[in-house]
Amino acid sequence: MTTGPGRDARELCAIADEALTEAAFCTGEFGDAERLFAEAEAMATRDGDREGAALAAGGLGMTHHYRNIAKLVTGDAVADADVAAEEDLMRRALARWQETDHTAGAARGLFGMGLVFQVLHRDWSAAMPYFWQAFGLAEAMEESGDRYGRSEVHRHVGFYYLVEDVRPREAVRQLEHSLALREQLGDPRRIPSALVSLGDAELVAGNTARAVDLLRRAVPMSHDAALLPWRIADAEQSLSQAEAAARG
């Protein structure tokens, strides 16, 4: 992937973010995203662009995060060095955002740290202080143009109410908001996983028919978007469980 001359760090981050989305949802190949974010970070640091440097560090952190998720879902252990690398990048991004007055950026940085503790350390009590702060700033994320970022915040708060502080109705509410934001964004790669999460929550809440409807949308959309095999399998498994529950 080539980027052409004359781009600044934030433009490079936008290209890197598209490469990351394609890798995380469709190809599993993270090399381009990692290279582009690293190039953007070096450029921003050279130019004294604090916001660009924060954005690039967060992008590198998210690249590591999605790569680590790919290991977890296939049953592989995430090496301690990989956990440490992701956490270091997320901390660096948050520290840089906190040096600016960029509210949406601070929300991104806080959310990234929440992911480290929720997903890698499996520690909701450590994750939620970060997630709650990001939740309080989520509107600023959308106002800055980061609708997907806001969707992710609502998604993980929804997970909290689904599996930790179990309140299925609140989980449904948060995951509905997350899905609506992704539908507004219109990226077909990002909608199926939101349908799956909401379908799973509706099933737990006892709304079996709605769960089946949501998951019957998710499965063909996953195939149409050529998502990664594990993402398609996740949608298909959730649909099978919901249909079994509907049959009683």
Predicted regions and their residues:
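Conserved alpha-helical positions within TPR/SEL1-like repeat arrays
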Residues: A14-C26, G52-Y66, A104-V119, Y148-F159, ...
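Ankyrin-repeat and related helical/solenoid repeat scaffolds used for protein-protein interactions
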Residues: E170-Q237
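Flexible inter-repeat linkers and adjacent short helices
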Residues: M1-D80, V219, L228, A235-Q241, ...
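Alpha-helical adaptor scaffolds
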Residues: G145-E176, A180-E183, R189
